């Protein structure tokens, strides 16, 4: 995913927050798209800080072992990306007779890519829930609500 910070930082932030909140160890982070589909990439470090969390204190470092174990690695040692992680999870759910709820926050680039690349897997999705995107001016300010 991209948005208020780079895809790398937002993935690291997700892993750090899961660790801080004591989430079960079998909840993983799959880094998403590194750029928007159409417009140029834009981050706002003056609003959200370089890492996208704006100076939040008390989280483990991004390279802490407990954060790094939140990433599933492929055979080359690179993190498995969101599209592949979503596809695998949804295929398992379908095989077990279940459906998933996809929750997305921020830009919906990964959802758009998933729907385009894996239309056959939409049958395994019960609903999409999202907080993100904007029409017109968007939410690019320190006081956007």
Task: Show the residue positions of the predicted features.
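Histidine-centered metal-binding segments
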Residues: 45-46
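Active-site histidine-anchored catalytic micro-motif
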Residues: 1-26, 36-42, 51-145
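A conserved beta-strand->alpha-helix junction
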Residues: 31-35
